Each structure stands twice: as structure tokens, then as C-alpha cells.
A protein has these predicted regions:
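An acidic-aromatic
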Residues: 29, 99-156, 298
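Edge/loop elements at the starts and ends of beta-strands within beta-rich repeat scaffolds
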Residues: 63-71, 81-86, 93-98, 116, ...
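Flexible, processing/modification-adjacent segments and terminal tails
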Residues: 57, 129-200
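N-terminal leader/targeting segments and the immediate start of mature chains
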Residues: 25-86, 298-308
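C-terminal motif of bacterial Sec signal peptides marking the signal peptidase cleavage site
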Residues: 20-24
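Gly/Pro-enriched, hydrophobic low-complexity segments
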Residues: 170-294
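Bacterial N-terminal signal peptides that target proteins for export
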Residues: 2-13
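Solvent-exposed loop/turn segments connecting transmembrane beta-strands
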Residues: 81-85, 106-113, 196-198, 222-224
Length: 308
């Protein structure tokens, strides 16, 4: 009975991870612009001191980025997909500009069940229960490629930072691409960036400049809409900076999937609660998959996910 429960739980968990990691895959066949659009760079009309204050605030938010090269932590990982919910333990291991890895344990037992690994060049998902793995290129997903969404955008979400789609980092010169509007020092200040069908909104504490939430909105007449929000809480000191020890990802979508595929749940929620956060550097950045493991396609995995 316990073994059956663990298998079901793990299947659900891997399925939700894949759906979260490949949210856009359901729309990858949609007719999107094949050219790489550039961010909206038209500056707003200057308004003297207010414009200067807004620009200074964007710079303050940008400067809040932590200096650490490595961030590691034990985590409590929870996910709700449709009416199904599960919580497990695991590890989060991140090395700046190299990798983001989430390792998850089998419920009740504690052994590693699988891992989700993002690098600059690929996404790797290892299923240790069934000795299978998926390895995909970001360029294989048209939605991600056409909208400049890559490893560095995902890294910025996990590291609580601003990002510019299609860029590897945000330079001081790029800060003019962001639009901030300080409305009330007692309320979070929105910082926005628009790119084709995408709109990004960072909500930052008007006094500290710490990013409390990110909203990503995608709207397309041909393939539906998707809203993703990432909320940050429990900020704790990391050197001279602060880093959120709690990350909650929410997704709502009306994305159209390939014919014959079950509809994607309209709502999905993923939570990562960090414990024992450290800057340990003594670990290998990249996973080597055993030759005994079978490589399966993204399409095969998506079919399994949507059939749950």
C-alpha cells in the first residue's frame, strides 16, 4: 500500500513539475511570430523630479541582488494541480549563471525520487523511480524562444531579481527599459516591462526596494492566455543583502493544447519553503545520467501528464 501511494504521489509530482517547467509547451505549435521581438524601449514622457525618483527606485531594486555565487537549502516543496495536492521534502541547489536544481524525495521514505535541473543550454528531468529522463533544449519550445525566455529569466525569478527577456544579465544601461511609478510609499511600487504578447510586472517594497511579487502575463488570440505570479516572503540576511526563503508560484491558463490532449488545469500552485540556507560550493553543477536510464521525449511526458 505504501509503495502504491509513493508511486502515485511521485507520478503526480513529476507531472506537475513538468507542467510547471514546460507551461508553454502546450502552445508551442501555435502560430507565433517567428522573429525575435525587442522589448518596448519607448521612454515615458519626462516628468522632472518624479521621473528621476522612479529611475532611482528601479536602480535601487536592481542593486538589491545578492552577491552570492551559490545558494543551497533543504526545502519543503508543495504543489497543487487542479484538485490534487502533495508536499514533499527535497533540496534546492543554485549556482549563478550555471544551474538551478530541485531534488525531490519520495514521500514517507526520504530517498531521492527525481530532480529537475535547469542549465544555460537545456532542461533535464530525471525520474529515479522509473529510470527515465527528459532532456530538452530551450529552442525546442517556440514560445520560449520567440519571447526571449531562457535560463536567465528563470534564474532571475529564483534569485529575486529583475530581468530583460533575451538577455543574460541586466546592466545599468538596460534599466531605462523598465517603467516604475511610485504611487504611495505605503504600497508596493510596480515596475513594468512589455515585450510583444508578454507583460512583466515586479511589485517592490517602496521603502526597501525588495521585490515582493512578479506577475507575468501572456495574451494571444490564437493560443489563449497565461498568468504566472511569483510571490516572495520570509526575507533573511545573506551577507549584506536579503534573500527570500519562501517562493510561491501561481499559474492560471487558458492555453490551447494539441488536439486529443486533455485540458491543462486552469490553476496550479507551487511552493518552496527553504530551510538551512547556505552558500555551499562543494557540489557538482551538472547531473550525469546513468547509461541505464531511458531517454523519453517531451511529447511523451506531456501526454502522461495530461492523462493523469
Amino acid at each position: 500500500m505504501k509503495r502504491s501511494y509513493n508511486k502515485i504521489a511521485f507520478n503526480l509530482l513529476v507531472g506537475c513539475l513538468m507542467a510547471a517547467a514546460l507551461t508553454a509547451c502546450g502552445t508551442k505549435k501555435a502560430a507565433l511570430n517567428t522573429q525575435h521581438p525587442t522589448p518596448n524601449t519607448q521612454p515615458s514622457t519626462p516628468n522632472t523630479q518624479q521621473t528621476t525618483a522612479n529611475s532611482q527606485f528601479v536602480k535601487k531594486v536592481h542593486d538589491n541582488a545578492v552577491y552570492a555565487k551559490n545558494i543551497t537549502a533543504k526545502i519543503d516543496f508543495s504543489i497543487m494541480r487542479g484538485d490534487k495536492e502533495i508536499s514533499v521534502g527535497g533540496k534546492l541547489m543554485m549556482r549563478r549563471d550555471e544551474v538551478i536544481r530541485i531534488q525531490l524525495n519520495v514521500p514517507l521514505i526520504g530517498m531521492e525520487a527525481g530532480r529537475l535541473e535547469f542549465t544555460k543550454d537545456y532542461v533535464l528531468i530525471v525520474d529515479r523511480i522509473h529510470s527515465e529522463y527528459v532532456k530538452g533544449d530551450y529552442n525546442q519550445v517556440d514560445f520560449l524562444k520567440n519571447n526571449g525566455l531562457n535560463f536567465y529569466a528563470l534564474q532571475a525569478l529564483f534569485w529575486n531579481q529583475l530581468f530583460v527577456p533575451g538577455q543574460t544579465k541586466v546592466t545599468d544601461a538596460m534599466l531605462k527599459l523598465f517603467t516604475a511609478e511610485i504611487l504611495n510609499t505605503q504600497q508596493p511600487t510596480p515596475i513594468t516591462l512589455e515585450k510583444d504578447n508578454m507583460k512583466y510586472t515586479w511589485l517592490a517594497n517602496s521603502q526597501s526596494g525588495l521585490i515582493q511579487r512578479v506577475d507575468v502575463d501572456y495574451n494571444s488570440k490564437s493560443s489563449g492566455s497565461t498568468h504566472v505570479s511569483c510571490e516572495y516572503a520570509d526575507f533573511k540576511a545573506m551577507g549584506v543583502k536579503s534573500f527570500p526563503n519562501s517562493i510561491t508560484l501561481n499559474m492560471q491558463t487558458t492555453a490551447q493544447l494539441p488536439a486529443g490532449t486533455k485540458k491543462m488545469p486552469k490553476n496550479m500552485k507551487l511552493g518552496i519553503r527553504m530551510k538551512s540556507v547556505d552558500n555551499d560550493s562543494k557540489w557538482d553543477a551538472f547531473t550525469t545520467v546513468s547509461k541505464k536510464y531511458k531517454q523519453v521525449s517531451v511529447d511523451d511526458v506531456l501526454k502522461k501528464i495530461m492523462s493523469m
